[in-house]
Design a protein with these regions (language model features):
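Accessory alpha-helical/coil subdomains and C-terminal extensions
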Residues: 1-122
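C-terminal non-catalytic interaction/assembly regions of soluble proteins
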Residues: 86-214
Length: 214
């Protein structure tokens, strides 16, 4: 995202980045929390596109480089709308392939920008990141943790233990019943972590929070 921010700043544009997230907005929330974007829209909350345009134009105006960034979950939808799909073709789980919300947001932001930019249109850079979010060179932790998980999983099998999930608990390797992840969907708690008016993450304190916050 930092490379794309440079492009947006050079041309003083709005930058729309579409990322994974069919039902949950963690892939948009965490980078925004880390400073990769000014705003984010997520599946857990239907956003007002005009409010988003207003906020991004304000962000751009106050930025010395004259650009602003929004991260868009692929499963996000605007007020009164629904999820957008590329086609009716479904995967092996019956899910239709998502696509189009980033394009919609980009077009609407450009059309609405004169209202919040003294009548002048702001052009938009629209980029669907897709698998680029999951790419990158592994660091030491990326190599050590899966090696440990694999060995621990084999240990469980050798002991005849099934239906268990290898986990990190309080910084130490452990295992737990697998239904802790299969019994429900993990979604962003918008009352706790998402400001629905400002369209970005919020938090009260980092004290005693898990490492990844959400």
């Amino acid at each position: 995202t930092h490379d794309l921010r440079t492009c947006a700043g050079s041309h003083e544009r709005l930058l729309v980045l579409e990322v994974f997230g069919r039902y949950a907005g963690f892939s948009a929330m965490l980078p925004t929390l880390a400073g990769a974007a000014n705003r984010c829209v997520i599946p857990e909350y239907q956003f007002d596109i005009e409010r988003l345009a207003e906020l991004l134009c304000q962000d751009r105006y106050t930025n010395p480089s004259k650009y602003s960034v929004v991260l868009v979950s692929e499963g996000a939808s605007y007020s009164g709308g629904q999820m957008m799909f590329q086609s009716d073709e479904a995967d092996m789980f019956g899910h239709k392939k998502l696509g189009g919300i980033g394009d919609y947001v980009s077009n609407e932001l450009k059309n609405l920008s004169p209202k919040f930019n003294k009548g002048e249109t702001i052009n938009v850079i629209n980029q669907k990141l897709g698998y680029l979010v999951r790419c990158g060179n592994p660091d030491a932790m990326d190599s050590i943790v899966p090696m440990a998980y694999g060995n621990l999983a084999l240990d469980l099998i050798s002991k005849g233990m099934h239906g268990r999930l290898v986990i990190l608990r309080n910084g130490r390797y452990d295992n737990a019943p697998i239904d802790i992840v299969t019994s429900s969907k993990k979604l962003v708690d918008i009352n706790k972590f998402y400001n629905t008016d400002r369209l970005r993450p919020q938090y009260n304190s980092f004290e005693f929070m898990p490492q990844m916050i959400l």
